[in-house]
Amino acid sequence: MNFLLLVLAALGFLTQVIPASAGGSKCVSNTPGYCRTYCHWGETALFMCNASRKCCVSYSFLPKADLPRLIGNHWQSRRRNTQRKDKKQQTTVTS
């Protein structure tokens, strides 16, 4: 019984001492990432912390790409307008 209590006390102490971030230290102060040898699934490396460790940041912290939505429709509508103008010019020239 005393041995079981000793084991439980040791495990409780170890949970306080061992870091929960898988051994990774924080990157630069403003970066929401951790320095690791390999990035976890769902993370990408932004820069190197040192020669062997990368600053791994979760995809959820990265900015989304800001692309215009109607690029394809815009060019199709412009193409139709030029074809209509060409047809009008052809009819006026031939008559």
Curated annotation (Swiss-Prot):
Residue ranges, annotated region (Disordered): 76-95
Major localization class: secreted
Keywords carried by this UniProt record: Antibiotic, Antimicrobial, Defensin, Disulfide bond, Secreted, Signal
Domain of life per record: Eukaryota
Compositional bias of kind Basic residues: 76-87
Cysteines joined through disulfide linkages: 27-55, 35-49, 39-56
Keyword Disulfide bond: yes
One GO cellular component term noted in the UniProt record for this chain: extracellular region
Subcellular location: Secreted
Range of residues in the leader sequence: 1-22
GO biological process: defense response to Gram-negative bacterium; innate immune response
Function per UniProt: Has antibacterial activity.
Protein family: Belongs to the beta-defensin family.
Protein name: Beta-defensin 132
Natural source organism: Pan troglodytes
